[in-house]
Amino acid sequence: MKTTIILILLTHWVYSQNPISGNNTATLCLGHHAVANGTLVKTITDDQIEVTNATELVQSTSIGKICNNPYRVLDGRNCTLIDAMLGDPHCDAFQYEKWDLFIERSSAFSNCYPYDIPDYASLRSIVASSGTLEFTAEGFTWTGVTQNGESGSCRRGSADSFFSRLNWLTKSGDSYPTLNVTMPNNNNFDKLYIWGIHHPSTNDEQTKLYVQESGRVTVSTKRSQQTIIPNIGSRPWVRGQAGRISIYWTIVKPGDVLMINSNGNLVAPRGYFKMRTEKSSIMRSDAPIDTCVSECITPNGSIPNDKPFQNVNKVTYGKCPKYIKQNTLKLATGMRNVPEKQIRGIFGAIAGFIENGWEGMVDGWYGFRYQNSEGTGQAGDLKSTQAAIDQINGKLNRVIERTNEKFHQIEKEFSEVEGRIQDLEKYVEDTKIDLWSYNAELLVALENQHTIDLTDAEMNKLFEKTRRQLRENAEDMGGGCFKIYHKCDNACIGSIRNGTYDHYIYRDEALNNRFQIKGVELKSGYKDWILWISFAISCFLICVVLLGFIMWACQKGNIRCNICI
């Protein structure tokens, strides 16, 4: 009986005794910042991982207008660039204009003699990149023909007129002699000459204007030669005309000579455009032009270039983000987010980074929570926080530097004859976009992985630094917490945080408390044995008491037991 009582008391003592006095020990936990609702990002190893903060890397909207600063933007209004270059009467205001970017509107139209340009896209690109319509007249001598032809389809004011940069030559009297004209280029720059050939709608119109039943135009330089024969025939009526003019162009290098030979149908040049090697360009857009500042322009409008990627438009001008297919790519600028649990383990509000993050930290990404004789508290660790921030801060700028284009992506145009070239160019362009889209996703995933790894590493560094300070004065409780075996007030906690903690000062006290606690602390395996032994003895005692009661009752006659055989 005495043995039973001793075992019961021992079992009660194991579970009720608190060997750690609140005044002689403390609990210190290390943790990191957390938010209630984080942001999902992609890493190399995870498609979705939650972080405390992230920055969007894809610009998906424009500001809806084109900024006229820092680039010189010229609004074409009702004129195309080619009409302005040819000298269409309603585009006279554009003579000698200059631009960085020429904006062509969908409302632009031609208002002169109907024409076509077999190599329209190339001529448009050359003139656009030159950045000016500066024109120099030259003294061509056209003997035996009538100059300055006019048309009722091309009116300047109330009078019949023609393209101001071209000279329509027709017969003089009843003759149209063969013309041979040369014009040397004695300058140190390339000259662009625009000329053409007239296609009458009928044979009668051909002989009426040029005498010969069929004319011919040959334009030559040392490097090239073009011979064009008019195609006589009726065409759909445009501005009252069934005839057409085909426009051609020739570039004459310094030291070269322009030679023109014709016996009819010639639309002659009046001079040349000075070729410039600028980074000017042209863009089709209906976005309004406004006074603002933006270094990147798209047909949708200007866009900020503070992000490395954009999916607003493939066509851009200026210093622009790289076009990709993705609508969103997020760069992690915070650590892995583990939202704080509402109910935690045996330490209540004191739980370390292994278990979860801490919400409400305002003085750092990493910090300490403690419980001692003076109560509980929390404080950030600025050094580890700053170390993580310094490594993350430069990420966005580095990604922008790697991806922003310092040039423009022009529109690609090809004639129907060049359909195969257009298909090939489109395939190449689409392949480039696919490649950049893949590279962008991979680059961001790598950066996100690095961010999460380095923020985790800073947490581990802080934990190891604290563990090395405390040494044998504390025990790692797991979960990012330490049990300190000596009295550690707020000043003591502060010394641990700032790295001035001297474990020798508290060594004796900690060892003494640790031995006292360990001396009476029973391991979980022995507790289980005691419980089972206690349970068995208790059951035995109950059986003995019950059997004794039955025997006593039988002796007194209170219980009767009949055994029948």
UniProtKB/Swiss-Prot annotation:
Palmitoylated. Residues 551-565 are cytoplasmic. GO terms for cellular component: host cell plasma membrane; membrane; viral envelope; virion membrane. The record marks R344, G345 as: Cleavage. One of its GO terms (molecular function) is host cell surface receptor binding. It is found in: Virion membrane; Host apical cell membrane. The keyword Protease does not apply. Residues 1-16 form the signal peptide. It is a single-pass type I membrane protein. Disulfide bonds join C29-C481, C67-C292, C79-C91, C112-C154, C296-C320, C488-C492. Coiled coil: none annotated. The chain crosses the membrane at residues 530-550. Keywords: Clathrin- and caveolin-independent endocytosis of virus by host, Clathrin-mediated endocytosis of virus by host, Disulfide bond, Fusion of virus membrane with host endosomal membrane, Fusion of virus membrane with host membrane, Glycoprotein, Hemagglutinin, Host cell membrane, Host membrane, Host-virus interaction, Lipoprotein, Membrane, Palmitate, Signal, Transmembrane, Transmembrane helix, Viral attachment to host cell, Viral envelope protein, Viral penetration into host cytoplasm, Virion, Virus endocytosis by host, Virus entry into host cell. Glycans are attached at N23, N37, N53, N78, N180, N300, N498. Residues 17-529 are extracellular. Pfam families: Hemagglutinin (PF00509). A lipid is attached at C554, C561, C564 (S-palmitoyl cysteine). Belongs to the influenza viruses hemagglutinin family. Binds to sialic acid-containing receptors on the cell surface, bringing about the attachment of the virus particle to the cell. This attachment induces virion internalization of about two third of the virus particles through clathrin-dependent endocytosis and about one third through a clathrin- and caveolin-independent pathway. Plays a major role in the determination of host range restriction and virulence. Class I viral fusion protein. Binds to sialic acid-containing receptors on the cell surface, bringing about the attachment of the virus particle to the cell. This attachment induces virion internalization either through clathrin-dependent endocytosis or through clathrin- and caveolin-independent pathway. Plays a major role in the determination of host range restriction and virulence. Class I viral fusion protein. Responsible for penetration of the virus into the cell cytoplasm by mediating the fusion of the membrane of the endocytosed virus particle with the endosomal membrane. Major glycoprotein, comprises over 80% of the envelope proteins present in virus particle. The extent of infection into host organism is determined by HA. Influenza viruses bud from the apical surface of polarized epithelial cells (e.g. bronchial epithelial cells) into lumen of lungs and are therefore usually pneumotropic. The reason is that HA is cleaved by tryptase clara which is restricted to lungs. However, HAs of H5 and H7 pantropic avian viruses subtypes can be cleaved by furin and subtilisin-type enzymes, allowing the virus to grow in other organs than lungs. Homotrimer of disulfide-linked HA1-HA2. This is Hemagglutinin. It comes from Influenza A virus (strain A/Equine/New Market/1976 H3N8).
